[in-house]
Amino acid sequence: MKTTLASSPPKRPIEWRKAFSAMRRLIKNPDATDEVFTIIEALSGNSLQKGFSRFVTTDLGREILVDRRSLLETLLNREYLATLPQHSLAALYLNFVTKENIRAEGLVAPSEGMRAMKNLDADTLLFANRQRDMHDLWHTLTHYGRDELGEVCLLAFTCAQSPNRGLAFIALVGIFQLSKRYGRGVYGAAYRAYQDLSLIHI
């Protein structure tokens, strides 16, 4: 299979008003995951297309597209994950989601309202879903928890791996809000998360 890219995809608008409205709702209700995706869609611009362009330059990326590998399907197959070696990423991930009582499809429903996802070609959609479904794998690799500070630090780390204006906005607002409660050390923790690949523990 040969993957082709549009030479210059139309530039998607940045919708700050929409993002700020969603952010106000998210601050009032931090569990409103759908607002996270509203902010990401409002501010991402062409981040997804840029990430996909990088993805298809790698051998592994092209292999994933050829094989139509769904990360979500793999993560949902707990029987298979349980057969893999004890200290593998699969085993660590399975232990994490079991302990936290969460499932891999937890972000699917909140992301379904994103208009931009509805018009993607099959390859870009597979990549976009893979980006979404990486979240709990990043938790596993970095050992950041699902508490507020852990999530903010994980967002900062994710921004370093996949630059995205929407994720950065959520992370910065989260850092500011947490610093009012816990002090300026929150800034240092988030900055370390952003810059330090040694946080990956496996």
Q: What name fits each language-model region?
A:
Residues 10-17, 24-28, 56, 99, ...:
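Mature, well-folded catalytic/scaffold domains that follow N-terminal targeting or propeptide regions
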Residues 16-19, 36, 48, 86-90, ...:
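Short runs of predominantly hydrophobic/aromatic residues within well-ordered alpha helices
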Residues 123-189:
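Conserved binding-pocket/active-site segment within a compact domain
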Residues 31, 35, 63-64, 101, ...:
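Residue-level signal for secondary-structure boundary elements
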Residues 59-139:
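Long acidic/polar interaction regions in large eukaryotic complex-forming proteins
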